[in-house]
């Protein structure tokens, strides 16, 4: 009888351990360090800047590491957008599902890349003037390091709309019209020293 109790005890302990919600950590590593800093695009009288810093997003399923970013836009010497202030270091979805007010770009790192290479990163962009999907941001864009000093910035609104509404029964994708962006959709930026 004692042996049966010991066996049952170990079975219950094992089941309890296996039933624990193990949180996964995704995207951790230093392969995105090359993105950190301020990047500038200038064309005629337009200046567009973005800044990136490392951060993470915590959810009930785990934590995802990536880049938080801010942006700045001036045209003909007039500042139209200036969201380069302090950025968050953590977005905890267990506390609030609403994205932080000072988060304008979120580019999560992925585990599917070799950690020794710098990956292209998909991103969500929170356009403070156009407010896609009521300010919830729009995916479909990406950033890609072309060289240590050159960065490709690309926003694809049609793809972002598709990702947001595809499969939703409450929204007809043909009725969601593009509204554009307040910043350049495609630009090659240079890293500031």
Task: Briefly describe each language-model feature range.
Residues 1, 32, 155-156:
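Intrinsically disordered, low-complexity regions enriched in Ser/Pro/Gly/Gln/His and often acidic
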Residues 1-23:
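Bacterial Sec-dependent N-terminal signal peptides
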Residues 41, 69, 152-155:
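Short hydrophobic/aromatic-rich beta-strand segments that constitute the beta-sheet cores
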Residues 45-136:
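Structured domain cores in non-transmembrane regions
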Residues 117-193:
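Glycine-rich, aromatic-bearing surface loops/beta-hairpins
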């Amino acid at each position: 009888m004692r042996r049966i109790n010991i066996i049952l005890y170990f079975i219950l302990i094992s089941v309890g351990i296996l039933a624990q919600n193990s949180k996964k950590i995704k995207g951790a590593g230093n392969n995105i360090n090359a993105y950190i800093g301020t990047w500038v695009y200038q064309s005629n009288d337009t200046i567009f800047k973005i800044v990136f810093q490392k951060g993470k997003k915590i959810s009930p399923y785990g934590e995802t590491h990536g880049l938080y970013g801010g942006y700045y836009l001036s045209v003909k010497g007039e500042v139209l957008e200036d969201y380069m202030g302090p950025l968050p270091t953590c977005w905890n979805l267990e506390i609030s599902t609403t994205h932080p007010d000072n988060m304008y770009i979120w580019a999560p790192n992925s585990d599917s890349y070799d950690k020794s290479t710098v990956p292209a990163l998909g991103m969500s962009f929170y356009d403070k003037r156009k407010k896609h999907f009521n300010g919830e941001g729009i995916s479909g864009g990406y950033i890609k390091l072309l060289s240590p000093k050159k960065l490709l910035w690309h926003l694809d609104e049609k793809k972002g709309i598709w990702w947001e509404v595809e499969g939703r029964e409450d929204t007809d994708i043909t009725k969601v019209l593009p509204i554009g962006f307040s910043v350049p959709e495609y630009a090659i930026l240079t890293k500031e020293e």
